[in-house]
């Protein structure tokens, strides 16, 4: 937190808090799909154009899309090729905007047990469940939690 404040200021830290709160709201809305927060919002390394990256898990894409439709969220779909070892796997990504840009990476249900590796650095991706995100918000943003929840 101290380094973030030193280099980027209070606005950056407040935006991180708001992005995490938005991610939590979305995760709660998507609970049937076991959402996990990944990327810059989970690590705290957000930049100006950062989006909220979530992994969701379903064996039926249409069920997810119906759920999004029922929530009234307008979205775009794309197929993204991810190289895993020596094979290429296609994954559906869903893009929408709710206060911030959101990207859902859609995986089969059983892949929730698979530790994904980052396409940028090859390291295991840390995925936060909603409870872990709540704990992170309370630990890293206690004064903002008190301010916004009172």
Language-model region placement:
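Catalytic core of pol beta-like nucleotidyltransferases
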Residues: 1-48, 58-150
């Amino acid at each position: 937190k101290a380094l973030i404040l030193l280099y980027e200021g209070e606005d950056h830290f407040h935006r991180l808090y708001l992005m995490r709160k938005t991610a939590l709201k979305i995760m709660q809305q998507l609970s049937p799909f076991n959402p996990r927060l990944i990327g810059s919002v989970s690590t705290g390394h957000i930049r100006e154009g950062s989006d909220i990256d979530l992994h969701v898990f379903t064996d039926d894409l249409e069920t997810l899309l119906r759920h999004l439709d029922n929530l009234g969220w307008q979205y775009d779909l794309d197929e993204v090729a991810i190289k895993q070892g020596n094979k290429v796997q296609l994954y559906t990504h869903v893009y929408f905007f709710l206060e911030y840009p959101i990207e859902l990476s859609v995986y089969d249900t059983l892949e929730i047990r698979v530790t994904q590796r980052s396409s940028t650095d090859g390291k295991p991706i840390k995925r936060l469940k909603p409870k872990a995100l709540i704990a992170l918000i309370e630990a890293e943003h206690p004064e903002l939690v008190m301010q916004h929840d009172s």
